[in-house]
Structures are given as structure tokens and as C-alpha cells.
């Protein structure tokens, strides 16, 4: 079974511990951050393509591209994130500034 049910760790643990069902719990965080990045870039999510990698609840956006032109949008996103309201994802923005990459899915998950 593939499950996107939250909370992911508790649901996956319960199913695998108390049943014979083989299950993998997945977080839809990559889709959440895709919408956040698109919003920061004043675009719709279908106008950007992102590549992410990492472990559940601690991934990194490695690439952001314009789906029409193929242009690298990471420099534009870094600039937009630097100008964003201070209350928007402060931990994620600090990690972006420190590492050059934006973590996902959100501050509360990354802080786990």
C-alpha cells in the first residue's frame, strides 16, 4: 500500500505493526513546496518544474525551471525569498541563505 495519509509516521507504523499489510508512507511535501515557490515567483505551479531529493520530511529543492523556456529560476527564487515577509518560512529561508537550497515541505516539518 502507498499511503499519503497524515500523520505519515504514525499511520505507517500502525498499519505495519498491527496488520500484515506492507505499506510505504509518503509525504506530498514536494507538491506543497512547488506551490509555495510558484507563489513566490508570481507564477502558477504548472509554469515551473522542480527537482527535489531527500528523506521524508527533510528534502531539498535542487532545481527550479521554467516549464516553457527551461530557464533556471533558482536565482530569481533566491532573490524573491530574500525579499519575502519575515514571517514566511523563516527557518527554510535561513537554510536557503546558508546552503543555497530551499528545504521542503515546510518549517514545521524540517524542524522535526
Predicted regions and their residues:
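Internal, well-ordered domain-core segments that constitute the primary functional module
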Residues: 1-64
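Long, compositionally biased stretches enriched for glycine and/or charged residues
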Residues: 40-112
Amino acid at each position: 500500500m502507498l499511503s499519503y495519509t497524515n500523520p505519515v509516521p504514525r499511520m505507517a507504523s500502525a498499519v505495519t505493526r498491527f496488520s500484515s499489510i506492507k505499506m510505504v508512507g509518503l509525504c506530498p511535501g514536494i507538491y506543497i513546496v512547488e506551490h509555495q515557490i510558484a507563489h513566490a515567483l508570481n507564477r502558477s505551479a504548472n509554469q515551473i518544474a522542480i527537482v527535489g531529493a531527500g528523506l521524508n520530511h527533510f528534502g531539498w529543492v535542487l532545481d527550479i525551471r521554467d516549464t516553457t523556456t527551461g530557464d533556471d529560476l533558482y536565482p530569481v527564487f533566491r532573490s524573491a525569498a530574500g525579499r519575502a515577509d519575515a514571517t514566511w518560512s523563516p527557518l527554510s529561508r535561513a537554510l536557503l541563505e546558508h546552503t543555497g537550497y530551499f528545504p521542503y515541505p515546510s518549517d514545521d516539518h524540517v524542524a522535526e
